[in-house]
Design a protein with these regions (language model features):
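Short, Lys/Arg-enriched N-terminal segments with co-localized hydrophobic residues
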Residues: 15, 20-33
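N-terminal FAD-binding dinucleotide-binding subdomain shared by FAD-dependent oxidases/monooxygenases
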Residues: 35-101, 118-245, 249, 260, ...
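Glycine-rich Rossmann-fold phosphate-binding loop(s) that bind the pyrophosphate
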Residues: 105-107, 283-284
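N-terminal Rossmann-fold NAD(P) dinucleotide-binding loop
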Residues: 110, 287
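Active-site signature of alpha/beta-hydrolase-fold catalytic machinery across serine-
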Residues: 116, 293
Length: 467
């Protein structure tokens, strides 16, 4: 998530855009004391108490196994990566031809690379994609409610080139996938694509000054340049839970949603779950989006949580047709530049996107907006940033209290960490879903699930039967 990394880098460098902020009039020590007093009395929280709470919650979740806590999706687990969206396997002969550029990946990175190469007049290109078509992660992630978290007018590339404006401020997966494939059509990338093909190796041949790229189709293509655009989200992760291979009910990974079993589609209507006891393991970004749909359809839904996500206001809305008609040439690049400037710590006269991501910067700016003759020290700026983060997270925790009726469930859904310690989420239906009588939060308080059995899941020492 480049915007998240940009923000975090921004924090570590003590806000380059605000480096000229000045402290006025009073000596530094007195102003810092005043700011501390304000944070406890006026902001309504105790920073020391929150720091202690954050440490306590962090320590519950420290693990010694690192990435070993996940299973590799191969062997007995390879079914979790089977593509449910490919109707038939494409048959073709192995390729051994030479091209100028091979692009690995058919998501937005690969599409952008292929399109720009085409615009530059590079005709001999090859795009290799293991999915059934262009779209990258959006080819796989078609779970109910899946949508972009960044404003779609910024997130979707080539909107102007395709004379396209998304239907919603945060558009959903079907439109994103369709737009991906429209890009492929616009720039004639389909004629250069090898779908259902996975790169297995690359070797540089010094003698002929070419890369040889081998694939699972027996290809041995050569190219002067190779562009890696496979992205970080190209393979599911499975939790290494004891007994995961013993469960006798139906299972699938959300990135390979089994609509043949659940019924319905990306918009919901999962009628196949009407008589089913369903378990969702994890409360990250995908769960935040799909839980409301499963909650409306399943007989019973148990949501297993190790660490709660921060869930802020989404406020999605349809695109205003009058606004769309008023857009002038260059609008999308200007909007992208404005967004990237703000979330990377820069300054802009106007916040064009004006959402949860850019609000973070506004919060930080408001906490260090002093005027005068003495500059804020890096330590003082860092302190102000921490207070701004505390303030925002207090709002998010208060939102859980406001939207969830049961006090114990609301408390368990409160995140106690800095905002970017876990990917921030935005959704208006997730928290209220826990008010439904058929929805149950199983909070493991950082421990995670104990075991998966033939019948269901053991968490907190109790077995919960599932279908």
């Amino acid at each position: 998530m480049p915007w998240a990394k940009g923000y975090w880098r921004f924090g570590q460098e003590h806000i380059p855009a605000l480096r000229t902020c000045i402290i006025g009039g009073l000596e530094t020590e007195r102003l810092v004391a005043m700011a501390e007093q304000q944070s406890t009395q006026e902001l309504g929280f105790d920073p020391d108490a929150l720091r202690a709470k954050y440490r306590e919650e962090r320590d519950k979740r420290l693990r010694s196994d690192g990435n070993e806590q996940y299973f590799e999706v191969k062997g007995d687990f390879s079914r979790y990566v089977d593509d449910p969206y490919i109707d038939e396997v494409l048959e073709r002969e192995p390729l051994t031809d030479d091209v100028d550029v091979i692009v690995v990946g058919g998501g937005f990175g690969g599409l952008l690379t292929g399109a720009r190469l085409t615009e530059a007049g590079v005709g001999r290109i090859r795009l290799i994609e293991k999915g059934g078509g262009f779209g990258g992660t959006w080819s796989w992630n078609r779970s109910p409610g899946a949508a972009c978290d960044v404003e779609s007018y910024v997130y979707l590339p080539f909107c102007e080139e395709l004379n396209f404006v998304p239907k919603e401020k945060y558009t959903h997966a079907p439109e994103i996938l369709a737009h991906s494939r429209a890009i492929g059509e616009k720039f004639n990338l389909y004629e250069h694509a090898c779908f259902q093909t996975e790169v297995e190796g690359m070797h540089w041949n010094e003698e002929i000054q070419r890369w040889t790229v081998t694939t699972n189709r027996g290809d041995a293509m050569t190219a002067k340049y190779v562009c890696m655009a496979n992205g970080p989200l190209n393979r599911p992760k499975l939790p290494g839970i004891k007994g995961i291979d013993t469960y006798q009910g139906h299972t699938f990974h959300t990135s390979r949603w089994d609509y043949a079993y659940t019924g319905g589609g990306p918009e919901g209507g999962l009628t196949g779950l009407a008589d089913k006891r369903v378990g969702i393991i994890g409360t990250g970004a995908t769960a935040i989006q799909c839980v409301p749909h499963v909650a409306r359809s399943a007989q019973e839904l148990h949501v297993f949580q190790r660490t709660p996500s921060s869930v802020d206001v989404r406020a999605n809305r349809p695109t205003d047709p009058e606004w769309a008609a008023s857009l002038e040439p260059g609008w999308q690049q200007a909007r992208m530049d404005n967004f990237n400037t703000l979330v990377s710590g820069g300054f802009a006269d106007e916040d064009l996107v004006n959402d949860g991501w850019t609000e973070i910067i506004r919060n930080l700016a408001s906490m260090v907006n002093f005027r005068g003759e003495v500059r804020l020290s890096p330590a003082e700026v860092a302190e102000k940033m921490e207070l701004a983060d505390f303030q925002k997270m207090e709002q998010i925790r208060a939102r859980a209290e406001e939207l969830v009726n049961d006090p114990s469930t609301a408390e368990a859904l409160k995140p106690y960490y800095r905002q970017f310690c876990k990917r921030p989420c935005f959704n208006d239906e997730y928290l209220p879903a826990f008010n439904r009588p058929n929805v149950h939060l199983v909070d493991t308080e950082g421990r995670g699930i104990d075991e998966i059995t033939e019948r269901g899941i053991i968490a907190n020492g109790e077995e919960i039967a599932l279908d």
